[in-house]
Amino acid sequence: MVTIRLARGGAKKRPFYQVVVTDSRNARDGRFIERVGFFNPIAAGQAEALRLDLDRIEHWLGLGATVSDRVSSLIKDAKKAA
């Protein structure tokens, strides 16, 4: 099953997440189909905290992809800000 979820990057104690489309059987930080955005939970100042390609996310949802709980709330925030 295809899912849209977060893949963790960054350094220890300084997380940075990629929003990726992947097969649910793949590892959290493993192979993915497409990168559709990023989320920086510790963004400060003028740093961009969230960027999502909503068109591509809608495309994948139309094809039957499921969304993780956290990504669902991020999509909601991005739509509210747009």
Swiss-Prot record:
Stored PROSITE patterns: RIBOSOMAL_S16
Pfam families for the chain: Ribosomal_S16 (PF00886)
SUPFAM superfamilies noted in UniProt: Ribosomal protein S16 (SSF54565)
An MF annotation (GO) of this entry: structural constituent of ribosome
UniProt KW keywords: Ribonucleoprotein, Ribosomal protein
UniProt-listed GO biological process terms: translation
Gene3D superfamilies in the cross-refs: 3.30.1320.10
GO CC annotations on file: cytoplasm; small ribosomal subunit
InterPro entries in alphabetical order: Ribosomal_bS16, Ribosomal_bS16_CS, Ribosomal_bS16_dom_sf
UniProt xrefs under HAMAP family: Ribosomal_bS16
Family assignment from sequence similarity: Belongs to the bacterial ribosomal protein bS16 family.
Protein name: Small ribosomal subunit protein bS16
Native source organism of the sequence: Pectobacterium carotovorum subsp. carotovorum (strain PC1)
Lineage: Bacteria, Pseudomonadati, Pseudomonadota, Gammaproteobacteria, Enterobacterales
Gene: rpsP
